[in-house]
Curated annotation (Swiss-Prot):
Protein location: Secreted
Tissue specificity statement from the Swiss-Prot or TrEMBL entry: Expressed in heart atrium and to a lower extent in heart ventricle, but not in brain.
Role description: Hormone playing a key role in cardiovascular homeostasis through regulation of natriuresis, diuresis, and vasodilation. Has a cGMP-stimulating activity.
Organism of provenance: Acipenser transmontanus
Gene this protein is translated from: nppa
Protein name (record): Natriuretic peptides A
Sorted UniProt keywords: Disulfide bond, Hormone, Secreted, Signal, Vasoactive
Positions of the pro-segment in this chain: 24-112
Pfam families attached to this UniProt entry: ANP (PF00212)
Signal sequence coordinates: 1-23
Modification after translation (UniProt): Cleaved upon secretion to produce the functional hormone.
Domain of life where this protein originates: Eukaryota
C-alpha cells in the first residue's frame, strides 16, 4: 500500500512540475513583445499580398485575352510566315500524336528479324543457338 502511494505521489509531482515549467514565460523562446511584432508584420504582409494579388489577376487576364482589346497588327515577320505557309497547312497536335503513336506501334509489332523463330524455343534461345550453332535452326559444323 505504501509503495502505491509513493508511486502515485511521484507521478503527480512529475506531472505538476512539467505543467509549471511550461507555464513559466522564462522558458519561452520568444518574448510576448517579439510575438506581437511578428503578428503585426504578418498582418501587414497579408494586406500587401491581397492588394498585389488583385492587380496580378487583372494583368494575367489581360495577357491571356489579347483579342479583347481588338485586332493587333502583326509584325512583318508574322505576315511573311502566314503568306508562305497558310494556316491550312499546319497539322493539328492530335494528328501529330496519332502519327507518332502509329509509328511506335509499328515498331513494337515489327518482327525482330525477317527469318522468324524456328519454333523450337523462344526467340532469345534461338539467337543464342544460332550464335553457337547448337540450337534447333543452327547448322552443325563437324
Amino acid at each position: 500500500m505504501m509503495l502505491k502511494t509513493v508511486i502515485y505521489t511521484g507521478v503527480l509531482f512529475l506531472i505538476c512540475n512539467k505543467v509549471l515549467v511550461r507555464a513559466d514565460p522564462l522558458y519561452s523562446p520568444y518574448s510576448s513583445k517579439d510575438l506581437a511584432n511578428l503578428k503585426t508584420l504578418l498582418e501587414r504582409f497579408e494586406d500587401t499580398l491581397g492588394q498585389d494579388e488583385g492587380n496580378d489577376n487583372q494583368q494575367d487576364y489581360d495577357i491571356a485575352n489579347p483579342e479583347a482589346e481588338g485586332p493587333q497588327a502583326g509584325s512583318p515577320w508574322d505576315r511573311e510566315r502566314e503568306r508562305q505557309w497558310p494556316a491550312s497547312d499546319y497539322k493539328k497536335p492530335q494528328e501529330g500524336y496519332q502519327s507518332q503513336s502509329s509509328r511506335l506501334r509499328d515498331l513494337l509489332m515489327a518482327p525482330r528479324n525477317n527469318r522468324g523463330s524456328s519454333g523450337c524455343f523462344g526467340s532469345r534461345i534461338d539467337r543464342i543457338g544460332s550464335m553457337s550453332s547448337m540450337g534447333c535452326g543452327g547448322s552443325r559444323k563437324g
